[in-house]
């Protein structure tokens, strides 16, 4: 929300300085985000170039004589601007002036041997824009000798506040002035709006077919207007807050929107056919809006239509067909009340952001619907002339204020601050609330412009933000001599350790949205009605995510689109299987794209630049589970994963027959097509909350590290097994042959060929043997090897490859 200081003072009688106003705004909850104060431009004056001759020693410089309008002799200025010429009127900086755009304080100096007494400035040097190809060139009637900042209306600071969604009353300059006055920083000026008598009825009638979408509608015809440019003061205010002046009629509606928080719309009455009907839009109905784009409407949107069709998207944007232009002579002024939720949903679905939508979706003051028409009528008559008809009001039955029972003691109970009863009631009264009664519990009537206030806690908040939250005395946090229990829960510890484990593996942590498109949710097992948002922040963020993978895959693709195709990302966060509290899961997930392997990415002379695959994802998943405390040696890997993985290049990690701890693999081509991404791409998900809790054991000191004094030995074995035998089964069989001596088993080769026989394959393993009590003899190694072969043969049917 932007406004100028002079605009604020139209509604607030105050002698407070800009700094005091800014400080007070923030202290009462209207956080100031930025102040554009051009006070540094006060020393710059409008000056006229009398002569411009070539510099004697520089081809690109000119020597100017400049009249600064101070009644003294013209000054000499050396200038390099290509547009410097006799007769030009621009902005002049005298010696001693600080020029913000170049961060220099001017002095009298010589430029290539010629003295220069000041500077003719460009827009960039005054920080007005990036334009620096020439000095500022003002109109011929610009008053020489006067302040440039005053002439260009740069001496009126622009204040921007960052509004929270619960403050619709502060979407107007008047509402902000009301808050400042309530805080004691000035007096609020009268808000009375003159009632303009009309001549005859407004011939266009209004029919409301959807009262649930439009509880009130006011319409007024003004005949004989002249729609030209708006006056300079109005244009300057709109420009200051970032709006583009269009015409007097349109500028009036924009002005009232910001001045009083009342969005309006104007129709060219000659372009309206028949009466106006407020109804639900028909499915597939189209309208060309004022932004020049055609929009397709749906039945959950509200439209204003006539015999020609839709003339306006209610509460969001008007239609081009009935818009006002320079030929408009008869105008219909519309002021209506629109359902906030419908307005917000319509704007999000169509992708339209307007100042009207911003206010209607937060809630406007219903009691200012008719006064808004009167205010706009007065401005139209003053700026465009014309003759008004009577105002047509349909549907609005008046505002019935809500009454809240307010115990005065709530202020102390909720804040710990003793605010006198009289002060509390006085603050509420200054804010427009109406306390009734004098006991310790008073009934408070809520003002029509505060739909955000609902109960007694809200009233306490209103009292405290005006009384001053800085009056709450700081309290130190309680200190404990010792912590007798765990600070973090098991799930929190697992989340932290999983993040560390994945980061160590070269993956970067990402934080993605919990909301994803419905199409993506369905690809990953979601899409249930219970997981659809009632009020999504965007049309493509409609479902709670059933998996972390869609967000991570999309993030990896965005990196690839920007030239970073080899990327490894992970996230540890929540997923949703339903809307129950017990249906939210804690998941660690990750994706690798391109050649982003554990040992590096990109092309290399060492030849490690192959694409990522299923085993990269498997290793990541196992590492995450191990960090979470899962018994890795007991995990079972089953071929095949959920439908979003490639059926032949994916797997499921289980602990026992029923407990699924994770999935991993390369993604199915249809999944990648549905997400509109490219590969190579693999990923994994492990369910952190599914890892069983370790059994409670008496606390023991960690045993000392005992290292064997004997040399470790490695032996290789190659077994021929059926193709259906998994490598993991063979590895576990080899490990079980002697758990005391065998410390590790790893697969280093898999071979299939006709020489092995039909449906056979060879798996080669490396067995690490660590003697503990003595150096093993050849006979010991032979006996151990025999046990390995026997155990593998017993559990897998494998035989040593000859």
From Swiss-Prot:
Q: Which GO terms describe its cellular component?
A: phenylalanine-tRNA ligase complex
Question: What GO biological process terms are annotated to this protein in UniProt?
Answer: phenylalanyl-tRNA aminoacylation
Report the EC code(s) recorded for this entry: 6.1.1.20
The cofactor named in the record is: Mg(2+)
Residues the record lists as binding Mg(2+): 452, 458, 461-462
Q: What class of enzyme is it?
A: ligase
Tell me yes or no: is RNA-binding among this UniProt entry's keywords: yes
- How is the co-factor bound, per the entry? Binds 2 magnesium ions per tetramer.
* Key word Transmembrane present: no
The record's listing under InterPro entries reads: aa-tRNA-synth_II/BPL/LPL, B3/B4_tRNA-bd, DNA-bd_dom_put_sf, Fdx_antiC-bd, Fdx_antiC-bd_sf, NA-bd_OB-fold, Phe-tRNA-ligase_IIc_bsu, Phe-tRNA-ligase_IIc_bsu_bact
GO-annotated molecular function: ATP binding; magnesium ion binding; phenylalanine-tRNA ligase activity; tRNA binding
SUPFAM superfamilies registered for this protein in UniProt: Anticodon-binding domain of PheRS (SSF54991), Class II aaRS and biotin synthetases (SSF55681), Nucleic acid-binding proteins (SSF50249), PheT/TilS domain (SSF56037), Putative DNA-binding domain (SSF46955)
- HAMAP family xref list: Phe_tRNA_synth_beta1 (MF_00283)
Subunit description: Tetramer of two alpha and two beta subunits.
Q: What is this protein called?
A: Phenylalanine--tRNA ligase beta subunit
Provenance organism: Mesorhizobium japonicum (strain LMG 29417 / CECT 9101 / MAFF 303099) (Mesorhizobium loti (strain MAFF 303099))
């Amino acid at each position: 929300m932007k406004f100028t200081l002079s605009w604020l003072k139209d509604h607030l009688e105050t002698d407070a300085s800009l700094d005091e106003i800014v400080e007070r705004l923030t202290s009462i909850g209207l956080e100031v985000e930025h102040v554009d104060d051009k006070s540094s431009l006060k020393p710059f004056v409008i000056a006229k170039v009398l002569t411009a001759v070539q510099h004697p020693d520089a081809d690109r410089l000119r020597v100017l004589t400049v009249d600064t309008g101070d009644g003294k002799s013209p000054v000499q200025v050396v200038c390099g601007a290509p547009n410097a010429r006799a007769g030009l009127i621009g902005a002049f900086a005298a010696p001693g002036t600080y020029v913000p755009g170049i961060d220099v304080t001017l002095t009298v100096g010589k430029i290539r041997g010629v003295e220069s007494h000041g500077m003719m400035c460009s827009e960039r040097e005054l920080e007005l824009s990036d334009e620096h190809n020439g000095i500022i060139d003002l109109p011929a009637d610009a008053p020489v000798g006067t302040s440039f900042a005053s002439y260009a209306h740069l001496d009126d600071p622009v204040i921007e506040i960052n509004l929270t969604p619960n403050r619709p009353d502060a979407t107007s300059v008047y509402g902000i002035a009301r808050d400042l006055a309530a805080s004691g920083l000035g007096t609020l000026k009268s808000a009375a709006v003159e009632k303009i008598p009309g001549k005859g009825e407004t011939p266009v009638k209004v029919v409301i077919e959807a009262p649930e979408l439009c509880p009130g509608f006011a319409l007024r015809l003004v005949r004989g207007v002249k729609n030209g440019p708006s006056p300079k003061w109005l244009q300057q205010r709109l420009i200051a807050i970032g709006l583009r002046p269009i015409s007097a009629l349109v500028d009036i509606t924009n002005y009232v929107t910001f001045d009083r928080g009342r969005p309006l719309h104007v129709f060219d009455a000659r372009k309206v056919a028949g009466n106006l009907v407020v109804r639900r839009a028909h499915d597939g109905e189209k309208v060309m809006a004022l932004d020049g784009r055609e929009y397709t409407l749906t039945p959950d949107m509200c439209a204003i239509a006539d015999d020609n069709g839709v003339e306006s998207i209610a509460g969001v944007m008007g239609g081009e067909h009935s818009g006002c232009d320079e030929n408009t002579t008869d105008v219909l002024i519309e002021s209506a009340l629109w359902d906030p939720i419908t307005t917000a949903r319509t704007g999000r679905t169509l992708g339209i952001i307007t100042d009207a939508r911003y206010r209607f979706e937060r809630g406007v003051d219903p009691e200012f619907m008719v006064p808004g028409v009167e205010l706009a009528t007065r401005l139209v008559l003053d700026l465009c002339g014309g003759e008004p008809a009577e105002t047509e009001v349909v549907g609005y039955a008046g505002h019935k204020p809500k009454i809240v029972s307010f115990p005065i003691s709530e202020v102390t109970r909720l804040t710990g601050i003793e605010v006198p009863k009289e002060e509390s009631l006085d603050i509420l009264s200054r804010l427009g609330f109406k306390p009734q009664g004098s006991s310790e519990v008073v009934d408070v009537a809520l003002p029509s412009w505060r739909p955000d206030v609902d109960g007694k806690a809200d009233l306490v908040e209103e009292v405290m933000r005006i009384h001053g939250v800085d009056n709450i005395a700081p309290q130190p946090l309680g200190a404990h001599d010792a912590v007798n229990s765990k600070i973090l829960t098991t799930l929190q510890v697992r989340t932290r350790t999983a993040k560390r484990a994945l980061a160590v593996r070269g993956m970067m942590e990402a934080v993605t949205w919990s909301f994803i498109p419905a199409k993506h949710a369905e690809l990953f097992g979601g899409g249930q009605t219970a997981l659809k948002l009632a009020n999504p922040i965007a049309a493509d963020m409609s479902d709670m995510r059933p998996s972390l993978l869609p967000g991570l895959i999309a993030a990896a693709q965005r990196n690839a689109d920007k030239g970073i195709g080899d990327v490894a990302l992970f996230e540890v966060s929540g997923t949703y299987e339903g809307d129950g509290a017990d249906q939210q899961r804690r998941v660690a997930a990750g994706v690798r794209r391109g050649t982003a392997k554990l040992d590096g990415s990109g092309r290399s002379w060492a030849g490690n630049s192959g694409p990522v695959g299923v085993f990269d994802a498997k290793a990541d998943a196992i590492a995450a589970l191990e960090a979470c405390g899962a018994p890795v040696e007991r995990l079972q890997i089953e071929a095949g994963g959920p439908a979003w993985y490639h059926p032949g290049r994916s797997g499921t990690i289980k602990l026992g027959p029923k407990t699924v701890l994770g999935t991993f693999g390369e993604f199915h081509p249809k999944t990648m097509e549905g997400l509109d991404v490219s590969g190579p791409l693999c990923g994994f998900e492990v369910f952190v909350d599914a890892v069983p809790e370790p059994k409670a054991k008496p606390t023991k000191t960690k045993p000392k590290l005992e290292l064997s004094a004997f040399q470790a030995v490695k032996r290789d074995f190659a077994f021929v097994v059926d193709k259906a035998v998994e490598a993991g089964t063979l590895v576990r069989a080899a490990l079980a042959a002697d758990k005391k001596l065998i410390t590790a088993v790893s697969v280093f080769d898999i071979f299939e060929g006709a020489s092995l026989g039909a449906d056979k394959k060879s798996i080669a393993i490396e067995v690490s043997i660590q003697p503990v009590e003595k150096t093993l003899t050849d006979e010991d190694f032979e006996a151990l090897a025999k046990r390995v072969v026997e155990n593998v043969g017993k559990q897998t049917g494998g035989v040593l490859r000859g």
